[in-house]
């Protein structure tokens, strides 16, 4: 099976992310806690380079807590990376994201911290943004591609958050990852294309 769903707005978003990243202090990458590996976009990781990164495992209330702890331990061993887990209905865990960003960047010159939030479609970025901003800024939904353009949001006096559209990579050749992304709603059903092998 090969999954090919890379609509025009995703290509545009990728170019905009590449252009904006040099001006960003930290990247907040939102992953689905149920499938952290499959929901991690390798294209975004390559673009991020050695930029500070906060890995947020969203929807942790739906995931295996022991597996979540293992993933957090893994992230916290990486250079310039920290992990945290948040639950959709647990507002305080989401608000911790701002504190972690401030701690990781450690900005002492009084300038604003510029953070960029990234992730594949439908992992919960918009819900997190709305909580951090204390108001409804981003549209939420159970279908992918709700957010289709960048928007800048002040979430505190010293942190600005740049919201980006959910972006997949052009071709997903790992069948298991593709199925998992489809199950959590990151890919539209019509995007599933079965490619027969010579033995079919």
Residue ranges with predicted function:
Residues 32, 75, 128, 163-164:
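Residue-level signature of catalytic and energy-coupling elements of molecular machines
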Residues 115-134:
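Glycine-rich phosphate-binding P-loop
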Residues 1-27, 33-54, 60, 66, ...:
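Helix-rich effector regions associated with P-loop NTPase G domains
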Residues 54-55, 116:
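A structural signal for isolated positions on well-ordered beta-strands in alpha/beta enzyme cores
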């Amino acid at each position: 099976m090969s999954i090919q769903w890379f609509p025009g707005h995703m290509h545009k978003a990728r170019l905009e992310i590449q252009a904006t990243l040099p001006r960003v202090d930290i990247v907040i990458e939102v992953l689905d806690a149920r499938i952290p590996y499959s929901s991690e976009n390798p294209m975004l990781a390559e673009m991020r380079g050695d930029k500070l990164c906060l890995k947020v495992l969203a929807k942790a209330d739906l995931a295996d807590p022991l597996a979540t702890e293992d993933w957090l331990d893994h992230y916290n061993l990486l250079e310039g990376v920290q992990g945290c887990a948040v639950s959709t209905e647990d507002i305080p865990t989401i608000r911790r994201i701002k504190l972690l960003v401030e701690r990781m960047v450690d900005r002492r010159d009084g300038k604003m911290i510029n953070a960029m939030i990234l992730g594949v479609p439908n992992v919960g970025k918009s819900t997190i943004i709305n909580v951090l901003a204390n108001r409804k800024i981003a549209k939420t939904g159970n279908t992918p591609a709700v957010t289709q353009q960048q928007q800048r949001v002040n979430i505190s006096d010293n942190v600005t958050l740049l919201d980006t559209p959910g972006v997949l990579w052009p071709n997903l050749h790992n069948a298991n990852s593709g199925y998992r992304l489809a199950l959590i709603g990151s890919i539209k059903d019509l995007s599933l294309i079965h490619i027969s092998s010579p033995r079919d």
